[in-house]
Amino acid sequence: MNLKKKNNDIVLEEVWCENGAGSTLPLLKYPLLEQTGIVEHCFTTRIGGVSKGIYESLNLSFTRGDEDAAVRENFRRLAGAMETDVSKFVFTDQTHTTNVRRVTAEDAGKGIVKERDYTDIDGLITNEPGLVLSTFYADCVPLYFVDPVHRAIGMSLSLIHIS
């Protein structure tokens, strides 16, 4: 699946990536963000994971009742597809605030391989290469920020709900 503009430029691209578990999973990417040379990014779908039942397949939430082991394996597969490690992920603690946290290498792994020492964070920013900023969306609009001057990136959710 690729979404295109009138002039046939690809706006959103589906890329199938090896996940390190012997299979593939689809990642959705914005070519314009990739072209900055500053950020590698993706959106996930529900395809390519191990969760069962109502959480089938690539559930990435530890807070919805899925088994932690399944969610961890799903993140391991996502990290494999992104050619990184889960210890590089940094998670928000989304509660619909306007709080944004600047994250550093000290924050790597918080929310997945070690405890978060912060709460009520709906946005993340960094200028440190190698960190994976992780935010979660259901009916909010995801926001990506790229600052080419300071070589910084950010992610947040909008406080405007789609539904």
Name every feature range the model reports, one short phrase each.
Residues 1-163:
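Active-site microenvironment for binding and transforming phosphate-containing groups
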